[in-house]
Regions:
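Low-complexity, compositionally biased segments
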Residues: 72, 80-82, 93, 103, ...
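Charged, amphipathic alpha-helical linkers/stalks
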Residues: 33-121
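Short glycine-rich, low-complexity/disordered patches
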Residues: 61-78, 98-103, 130, 143-147, ...
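Extended non-globular C-terminal regions
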Residues: 111-237, 241, 245-265
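Helix N-terminus capping/helix-initiation residues
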Residues: 10, 60, 79, 107, ...
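Short, conserved structural patches
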Residues: 1-62, 197-199, 207-438
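Sec/Tat-exported extracytoplasmic proteins
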Residues: 62, 91, 115, 119, ...
Length: 438
């Protein structure tokens, strides 16, 4: 707020031959209102094999954590501001600002080491991170913390003067966000053969878009600050064999999933007294395109261009040929306003939104829209004609619907992505008293 005061001055000795001058003063006062908030999706179920494959793929090494390890990491929270402070000690930047640390390039191992020494972390969780750190030291990926954390106006403060701001983040979310940032948008090839029960083989190609540095999934800022999840493309090729319903023929299920980033915008902060406040956040979930078909992965990581998806050979043998394709979309782009009271903020309560047409069972939804071309190449093959073949194929695919759904769900959630949904939480709000700044 800028205030300009003008008053008529007083003169004494010169009052007989001149008029009194006008005297003015200008002052500017500022009242800063900020909040710490994040967007993402918390893992509700865990698959040890998928998690190890994906994290290992991002790091370019082999990860062998146990299910209990992941459960501990998912359950743990940490103050990201304290992570920066721990890293500042390691980097000998304690006399600098938070921005100095955020902009310094570090290895993934250095990040994990700082995470283990962060104030408030449970010893059991720190031990898990130390185990992962030994593996990460074999990786050569590097990152800058500004790629996963935006501290806004707090960036210019000296290390240790963060005024106990609660920038709460999940430990699992942080280590995965750092792995994605360090990977630099490279395309990943994952072989999940032994990890998904009931499927002969599973191969996946994954590409993760790089969000602008100013909009990571965790931030501190005032009205208008934006956080986003990663834009993600996933092509999965599932093979099921030995299925008697269609004469023991091998069935190929190629799936393509593209999820746009979910976005949360700090819409308003209303101060309620005593430094407390209520925060409004506008959220748009990550909409998706899901297809059954062959996706061209040659330029998968180029998010400026849509990959071509063509009809796929679901069954290809000397006896029978079945080609098919399907496409579904979750396309609701309506903003949803979430309001966080002071009680919600104190408890770091997670609130969720979803599209009106959320895809809850991806594969079964695709099968309802499946277009098939069936060619019976061996006339004596008795499958009851075209209707019988369609029924046999439907029964075969129904068997693998649940494990493939679980596969897609887990791979995307590791990246903080849930199709058509988003989880948001506000963990601190500051309503500072007006102060003269000029």
């Amino acid at each position: 707020v800028k205030v300009n005061i003008v008053e008529k001055g007083q003169i004494f000795f010169a009052a007989a031959f001149t008029t009194p001058p006008k005297v003015s003063a200008v002052g500017t006062a500022s009242s800063q209102k900020i909040a710490a908030f994040s967007v993402g999706s918390r893992l509700a179920s865990l698959d040890e094999g998928i998690l190890n494959s994906l994290l290992g793929g991002l790091l370019g090494t082999t990860v062998s954590l146990k299910l209990m390890d992941y459960q501990g990491l998912v359950a743990a929270d940490v103050n990201a501001l304290h992570v920066v402070e721990a890293l500042a000690i390691d980097l000998k930047l304690t006399a600098g600002t938070y921005k100095d640390v955020l902009k310094t390039e570090i290895t993934y191992g250095q990040f994990l080491n700082a995470l283990t020494k962060t104030t408030g972390l449970q010893p059991a969780v720190a031990n898990i991170l130390k185990t992962l750190e030994k593996t990460a030291n074999k990786s050569n990926i590097k990152l800058k913390l500004e790629e996963i954390l935006n501290l806004g106006p707090s960036s210019d403060k000296l290390i240790g003067s963060g005024e106990n701001l609660k920038v709460t983040a999940g430990v699992f979310d942080l280590l995965n966000a750092a792995a994605v940032a360090g990977n630099g948008g490279n395309q990943l090839a994952l072989n999940l053969n032994a990890n998904v029960l009931g499927l002969a083989s599973v191969k996946a190609t994954l590409a993760i878009g790089e969000p602008p540095i100013e909009t990571p999934s965790l931030a501190v800022g005032g009205q208008g600050t934006i956080v986003r999840t990663a834009q993600t493309r996933l092509a999965v090729n599932v093979v099921v064999d030995g299925l008697q319903a269609i004469a023991g023929l091998k069935v190929n299920i190629p799936l393509y999933v593209e999820v746009a980033h979910a976005e949360a915008r700090l819409a308003d902060i209303r101060c309620t007294g005593g430094g407390q406040g209520t925060v409004d956040v506008e959220v748009v979930p990550g909409v998706a395109e899901i297809a059954l078909g062959n996706a061209d992965t040659s330029a998968f990581a180029n998010f400026g261009k849509d990959p071509r998806v063509t009809k796929a050979a679901i069954v290809d043998s000397a006896l029978l040929a079945i080609n098919g394709s399907a496409l579904i979309n979750a396309t609701n782009m309506t903003k949803t306003k979430l309001t966080f009271t002071q009680s919600d903020i104190t408890q770091a309560k997670i609130k969720s939104i979803s599209t009106k047409d959320t895809v809850t069972t991806l594969v079964s939804s695709l099968l309802k829209n499946l277009n098939l071309d069936i060619r019976l190449l061996f006339l004596n093959l008795d499958l009851g004609g075209l209707a019988g073949i369609q029924a046999a194929l439907a029964n075969t695919l129904a068997v693998v619907t649940a494990p493939v759904d679980q596969l897609l769900y887990n791979v995307l959630l590791v990246l903080g992505v849930k199709i058509g949904e988003a989880d948001v939480r506000v963990t601190d709000v500051r309503c500072q008293q007006p102060a003269l700044v000029q």
